[in-house]
Amino acid sequence: WANCAVNVAGSMGERGDGAYKDNFTKETWKKTVKSIETIIDEAAPKHTYYTIEPMPWMYPISPDEYLHLIEDVGRDRFAVHMDIFNWITTPYRYFFNEEFMEEVFEKLGRYIKSCHIKDVLLEQDFTMMYREVKCGGGIINLEKYAELAARYNPDMPMIIEHLHSEKEYLESIEYVKRRLKL
């Protein structure tokens, strides 16, 4: 059986994972909680967790907000799929990403069932833009990320995503293996 099923909270606009102002209303929070409760209650999983992947423009957008979501949902089969890279949306979180990782794992580590592993690069331009890049193309300390995840699960699933070619995936896998001495 699967360790977890990963989804996003969803958006209040045309695109299911899109960025919209209405993603951040109290009504959207209530709909998100109700949706998660309904999915878990109807599926009644015994061995698998239902998880929400954090996104930069929909609930939850911080570790504290994710804890609040866990509390509001109140289901033991609700957990976390961690994509910390989607939360690196400010200069502080970017430049102090190791401290941010520590905060995230301290607060959510016991709930995390799987992780995305990738890298982030701040474009050197006057309009701030973060670009998701292959592992090794940004500034993230991947060893620290893997070490923090392993504290909670030595066999934590780590998933690479959003690359443009098989070659990029293979390069990222080799880079991660070298960095993590696998």
Please provide the spans of the model-predicted regions.
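Histidine-acidic metal/acid-base catalytic patches
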Residues: 37, 63-182
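Active-site acidic/histidine proton-transfer and metal-coordination neighborhood
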Residues: 1-80
